[in-house]
Amino acid sequence: MTHIAIIAPSFEGDGDSPQIALDWIQSHGWQGHSFLPPQGSHPVFAAPQAQRLTHLLRAIEDPEIDILWAIRGGGGSTLLVPELLKRKDSLMKRSKPLTLMGFSDITALHVAGHQELNWRCVHTPTLKSIFRTDPQSLELLVHLIQHKTVRWEAP
């Protein structure tokens, strides 16, 4: 079974978007895990920097997790990169590969994760925006998570 961690290294998922995302993940037969700080923890970001880092590290270090999927981009993940790289040696000890999914500010984590931590990185919609994704792209994304061959053809 694929285990997906819902993370918020940048902005938070507001309202009921975290629960909707968790329900969507589970509706596909995957196991969803929330690594989100309490909503409203910070006036701008999902939480203060130290708290966002702690939640992200918990997700990375959880041996069950296959995929880290950001609930939202926006800003703030760049601030976490130096702290992740300080822990590079311990983070590289994962027994199975880790995939990071998301876009926007999450791109900073994509670059660091791919170049320094050996993560597989896929530039995808965030979980908050997944429901505004066109059906063809969403179907390809589901196939990608299911490890099926993905081929995109222009209409």
Model-derived regions: residue spans:
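Conserved anion/nucleotide-ligand pocket segment
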Residues: 118-155
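N-terminal glycine-rich "phosphate-gripper" loop used for MgATP/nucleotide binding
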Residues: 67-83, 103
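Structural motif
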Residues: 4-5, 66-67, 99, 119-122
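ATP/NTP phosphate-donor binding region
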Residues: 1-64
